[in-house]
């Protein structure tokens, strides 16, 4: 899975791109002048996430399939924990928790193991969990919230 930025990303956008790639065990590149076809080539037959900006801040995620077709997009504002700088991301695939349209879209895109919200507390201590709700997407590690996306809009194509 490849995660990339808009063409001229701000430092905040690059930071979010790197965090997402570490969380979902994907690969992060800075887009530069690459077009969509070049990005699809870099994705090596896998899906693609493009982090877009709104007023210089990360504000949109576009989720593309391996052919470059936009599947869905998510508009958001972001929040980071003070612990994020010292957190070590294990090289494990995260699990997905949550209900609703966004959680369903994430399940079909990422193919992560999905668990019920009640089962999250029973996961091993180093587990990373993507908790997707209709208003908020919480990225947790070792039981702590690392960063969140406050959902402002969701659109399927």
From Swiss-Prot:
SMART domains: Brix (SM00879). This is Probable Brix domain-containing ribosomal biogenesis protein. Residues 1-157 form the Brix domain. SUPFAM superfamilies: Class II aaRS ABD-related (SSF52954). Keywords: Ribosome biogenesis. It comes from Methanosarcina acetivorans (strain ATCC 35395 / DSM 2834 / JCM 12185 / C2A). HAMAP family: BriX. One of its GO terms (molecular function) is rRNA binding. GO terms for biological process: rRNA processing. InterPro entries: Brix (IPR007109), Brix_dom_Rbsml_bgen_prot (IPR023548). Probably involved in the biogenesis of the ribosome.
């Amino acid at each position: 899975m490849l995660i990339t930025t808009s063409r001229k990303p701000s430092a905040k956008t690059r930071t979010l791109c790197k965090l997402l790639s570490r969380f979902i065990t994907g690969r992060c590149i800075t887009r530069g002048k690459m077009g969509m076809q070049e990005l699809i080539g870099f994705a090596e037959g896998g899906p693609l996430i493009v982090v877009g900006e709104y007023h210089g801040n990360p504000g949109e995620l576009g989720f593309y399939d391996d052919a470059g077709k936009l599947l869905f997009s998510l508009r958001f504002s972001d929040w980071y924990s003070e612990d994020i700088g010292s957190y070590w991301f294990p090289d494990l695939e995260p699990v997905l928790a949550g209900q609703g349209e966004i959680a369903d879209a994430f399940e079909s895109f990422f193919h992560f193991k999905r668990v019920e919200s009640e089962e999250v507390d029973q996961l091993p201590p180093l587990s990373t969990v993507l908790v997707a709700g209709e208003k908020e997407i919480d990225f947790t590690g070792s039981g702590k919230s690392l960063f969140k996306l406050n959902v402002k809009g969701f659109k399927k194509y």
